[in-house]
Amino acid sequence: KTWSVSVSDLLDELPGINTDGIGRVAFEPESGYVDPHAMVEAVVNQGVINGGEFTINNPVIGIDTSGNTSIVKTPAGDIETKIVINAAGPWAHQIGLWMDIDLPLEISREQDIMVRPNNDTSVITRCVSNMVDRTYIRAEPDGLVLVGTGHPKENKPANPDLYKKEADQEFVAETSRLLGHRFPSLSGSEVVKSWAGLYTITPDWNMILDRSPVHENHYLAVGGSGHSLKISPAMGQCLAEMIVFGEAKTVDISDLNARRFDTGQIVQSTYGGNRN
C-alpha cells in the first residue's frame, strides 16, 4: 500500500531530513528490498535441485540458426537446442544479432556509493527515493548508507566487457553533496566504497518479453531498464508459460512485445528513466 502523507508526517519518520523543496510524500511502510546476490544464488540453487545445469566462464560466441534447431556456440563446445532464450542483460544486443534480430537496446553505466555516517547512525531508518534531488538512499544492516542518483540524468554508454566498475570522482563528490544537503548530519561522511553496474535500456524503459518475430522457438527477455530484478519472478513465470502454452497465462504481457518500437505502440508508464 502507498499512503500520501504530509511533510510533518515525514519528519516523524525521518526527523533528520531537510524538507526544503518537499511538498508531499508517498509512504510505503510495508515495502522492502531484496539482496540481489542472495536472490540470484537462491534461484540457481533451486534450479539445480530441479535438474537444471548452469555453466560459468563459458560465454556464448555465436549462434547458428540455419537449421531446424539452433546451435549455440561456446568455448567449451556447441549446444544444439530447439529453444533459445535471450536473457543476456547488457550482452543482449550482440546475442540478438546472432539470433537474426537487431534489438533497440542501449547500455548505461550506473553508479552508487556507500558512506559511513560520521555520528548519527540512526538518521536513515527508511528507504528514501528523493525525487527533488533525484537520489535514493538506504541504510545497510552494517550501519553504512547506500546512495545513488535517479533519473532523469545523462546516460553513460559503456562496453559490457570493458568498463570502469568504480564510481567516478565527480559522481562521488556530487552524490555526497546531495546526501549532506538532504540529511545535514550526514554531511562529510566518509565514502568507504563505490561501484558501477550496467542498465540495458529500451526506448520506453520497459523490457521486451516476447517470442522473437524472426524465429519461432527463440524468446526474448531483455531490456530490463534497471527494474528487471524486482519483476523477475513474474517474468520467468510468463516466459515459461509462453514456451509451454504459446502465451502467458498469469498476466497479459502483450504490451511488452518486441514489435512495439516499430509500430509506435510503446508502453506509456515506466518505473523511471529519462522520460517525461
Per-segment meaning from a language model:
Residues P36, R177-N276:
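C-terminal catalytic lobe of FAD-dependent flavoproteins
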Residues A26-I83:
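Helical element adjacent to the flavin cofactor pocket in flavoenzyme catalytic cores
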Residues T2-N50, A158-L162, E216, V222-G224:
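Helix-loop-beta segment of a Rossmann-like dinucleotide-binding subdomain
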Residues D102-P104, P117-H218:
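Active-site lid/adjacent beta-loop-alpha segment flanking the redox-cofactor pocket in flavoenzymes
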